[in-house]
Regions:
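Blade/loop signatures of beta-propeller domains
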Residues: 22-35, 70, 189-191
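Beta-strand-rich domains and repeat architectures in extracellular enzymes and scaffolds
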Residues: 38-74
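Non-catalytic accessory segments flanking enzyme active sites
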Residues: 48-50, 154-156, 162-165, 185-192, ...
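Blade-terminus and WD-like Trp-Asp/Gly-His loop motifs, strongest in beta-propeller folds
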Residues: 50-57, 98-107, 144-152, 225-233, ...
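A flexible loop/linker signature enriched in serine peptidases of the S9 family
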Residues: 62-75, 90-96, 106-122, 130, ...
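Short loop/turn segments that connect beta-strands within beta-propeller blades
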Residues: 80-84, 125-129, 196-200, 256-260, ...
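Cap/lid segment of the alpha/beta-hydrolase catalytic domain
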Residues: 407-533, 540, 574-581
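Active-site-proximal cap/loop segments of hydrolase catalytic domains
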Residues: 434, 488-681
Length: 681
């Protein structure tokens, strides 16, 4: 469903000043010796590694940009775990994803679009031949799972819209609930189906106004469905409504396939998700916030059997976890989360203490999800990066082994001169118990001369439940290649230290994090490497919030870039996809008690009169996560007062551009704006 007119051009410009650009940053025909926009076009993304049942190979999704057609081409590659030998197996199919091995290892099933552009299940015989389309769902299939004996699939698909005739076709009013203001209809529920692995007619397993979850990027994938070990039951997550703001009302359920009866697994009616039965059928792991409050980090809980709340087995680690992967012996889970200046993997026994795995300089991808798999002999495969290397697939041959790079999809980057990055630490400016040791990542320009003072560009991460890590960063390397220092500070609310650090942002959305960022800048100044007259602040999403907040609380900034900026928390509460779920981040609804003043005081737009920094605003028109109304508010707050500003909007849905051309355009405009205000080394 298209929300906006196709007559809109690729992006439109609202400018408060005449031709203020010195010209477009050129896109080289061939990549240079340092990281540039041409290198962005050469990057390959790898994700979703799945180890074969014999443990000898894995299949992974490989995604490359096609600028001529503005597409992300996703194919499946088979990789030998011993040698790294790689071959593509989907024979030119351009939209393959979600690969899953059959239990016997003779087939790989995956999702791809059919002629009607609906995702269907395709099955590929590993002995040879082309994949065949198994399903003919009238709507896109969201996910699937093999039955343990390989005889069938369970899958989740959105219900088909009811057919209307005559005047009823135009009767399209819908009841508004806790949804996004961009909704043009009430979302239909997603339900479970089963189909034979040989094909044929699918059987509906569930129905009703409730729904299985669907993905709302940026965020984790939908909570996976899973068969129990004996294949008699299905485990899934149930949401009580289809309204996006009600996603927190989630609870794990189990469906008996023989009787059709479904029951809740735990007593939790909110925040419980990602249930995974153990291979031996004796346990179930699921994700749930400690103490049942979504202000806290998520932990892994383990239930004996399929009934009960279980017990928290990861609270001692004190990190934020999104997923549990069972080891083959069912005695432990593998999990991961952000940790200090990197991300970590742990093996957590059902009973006993966790062991952190040795990953060296490799940072696993943990953005809302642990992109990993555990093999039949206990191998662990995951996607990750190193500070000077884009994403590849890495393997731990055993829990005690060191991570080794398995793939070389981005091998060309090995010869590139990149900026060195390092971890910077400082003490937060608050008194105990909030005088944390904090960190951030500093990236130098390539061939930096030690001690030389350079302009400083802040790139502040979003979330805020996320963190900047000493890993490969496209933004940091692109900006550093211009001759500037790049600083990616972590701040209270980040999830790289402990639960107390993460929840310290509650009812302190900007002031506390702002003090943390200022303290980090002061630490860099003391090194004598910062040109203090030339400091810029930038960020996307919550990074855009922090950018907007900081330009209203300090005037030393030379330039600012606010991508998808949260400027008005009232708009976030009333208009965004999460809407009412955001109340816990402040303490209560702005329309109850005396909470309104908290929401207003923590909104950057409240301090518009102090904003004096030349600012670039970037946003998608159909941004459901951070409404574009807030971009307009920031734009007018600056423009109407004579502050130099430009606002570029992309006429697409989503929280940020996902297509190659617009992604590159964001990078390009980022550099161009900074180039107007910062000198080069």
């Amino acid at each position: 469903m298209k929300i906006y007119s196709p007559l809109l051009i690729a992006c439109f410009l609202i400018s408060a000043s005449p031709a203020s650009s010195s010209g477009r940053v050129p896109i080289p025909d061939t990549p240079g010796k340092v990281f540039d926009l041409a290198w962005v076009g050469k990057m390959t993304r790898v994700s979703d590694p799945q180890i074969a049942p014999d443990g000898k190979s894995l299949v992974t999704v490989v995604t490359t940009p096609d600028y001529e057609n503005d597409l992300n081409i996703s194919e499946l590659a088979l990789v030998d775990i011993s040698s790294g030998a790689t071959r593509f197996i989907t024979h030119g199919r351009k939209n393959a994803g979600f690969p899953r091995w059959s239990p016997s290892g003779d087939r790989v099933a995956f999702l791809a679009a059919d002629g009607d552009k609906h995702n269907q299940i395709f099955v590929l015989d590993m002995a040879g031949g082309d994949a065949f389309q198994l399903t003919k769902s009238p709507t896109s299939i969201q996910q699937f799972a093999w039955k343990p004996d390989g005889s069938a699939f369970a899958y989740a698909a959105i219900d088909e819209a009811p057919k209307k005739t005559g005047a009823d076709k135009f009767d399209d009013a819908f009841e508004v609930g806790n949804g996004s203001f961009l909704d043009k209809e009430k979302a239909l529920p997603t339900h479970l189906w089963q189909v034979s692995a040989a094909g044929g007619e699918a059987k509906r397993l569930t129905s009703g106004t409730w729904t299985l979850p669907v993905a709302f990027p940026p965020g984790p994938p939908a909570s996976p469905i899973a068969f129990t070990a004996d294949g008699s039951k299905l485990v899934y997550v149930r949401l009580e409504t289809t309204y996006s703001g009600d996603r927190r009302h989630s609870s794990p359920h189990v469906l008996d396939l023989a009787t059709g009866r479904s029951e809740p697994i735990t007593t939790h009616t909110m925040f419980a998700s990602f249930p995974v039965p153990s291979p031996d059928g004796k346990h179930l792991a699921y994700v749930y916030p400690r103490d049942g409050s979504d202000r806290n980090y998520q932990d892994i809980f383990v239930v004996d059997g399929l009934k009960g709340d279980g017990r928290n087995i990861t609270h001692v680690i004190d990190r934020n976890f999104f997923r549990a992967l069972w080891t083959p012996d069912s005695k432990a889970i593998v999990t991961g989360g952000n940790d200090g200046a990197t991300a970590g993997l742990w093996i957590q026994p059902v009973d006993g203490h966790a062991t952190k795995l040795d990953l060296g300089d490799v940072t696993p991808n943990t953005g809302f999800w642990l992109d990993a798999d555990v093999g039949p002999q206990g191998q662990i495969a995951f996607s990750g990066t190193e500070p000077h290397r884009p994403a590849e697939i890495y393997v731990l041959d055993s829990p005690g082994a060191k991570a080794r790079r398995l793939t070389k999809f981005n091998a060309d980057f090995d010869a590139l001169t990149l900026g060195k990055s390092e971890v910077v630490t400082w003490k937060s400016p608050d008194k105990a118990p909030k005088n944390w040791t904090e960190n951030g990542i500093l990236t130098y320009p390539p061939n930096y001369a030690p001690g030389k003072k350079l302009p400083l560009v802040l790139y502040i991460h979003g979330g805020p439940t996320s963190s900047s890590k000493n890993a490969f960063s496209v933004f940091a390397q692109l900006i550093a290649a211009q001759g500037w220092l790049v600083f990616e500070p972590n701040y209270r609310g980040s999830d790289n230290f402990g639960n107390d650090y993460g929840r310290a942002i509650v009812d302190d959305s900007g002031d506390g994090p702002g003090r943390d960022v200022f303290a980090g800048i002061e630490t860099l100044k003391k090194r004598g490497i910062v040109d203090e007259a030339n400091i810029a602040v930038t960020g996307w999403s919550y990074g855009g919030y922090m950018t907007s907040w900081l330009i209203g609380h300090a005037q030393f900034w030379k330039a600012a870039i606010a991508g998808a900026p949260v400027t008005n928390l009232l708009d976030q509460y009333t208009l965004s996809d999460a809407n009412v779920a955001r109340a816990t981040s402040i303490g209560g609804s702005p329309y109850t008690g005396d909470w309104m003043k908290h929401w207003v005081e923590q909104s950057p737009i409240t301090y518009y009169q102090k904003m004096k920094t030349p600012t670039l605003v970037l946003q998608d028109v159909g941004d459901y996560r951070v409404t574009i109304t807030q971009g307009y508010e920031l734009y007018h707050a600056l423009k109407d007062r004579g502050i130099q500003t430009q606002f570029y909007a992309y006429p697409i849905g989503g929280h940020s551009p996902a297509d190659p051309v617009r992604i590159r355009d964001v990078y390009r405009r980022w550099i161009e704006w900074l180039d107007l205000y910062l000198p080069h080394s």
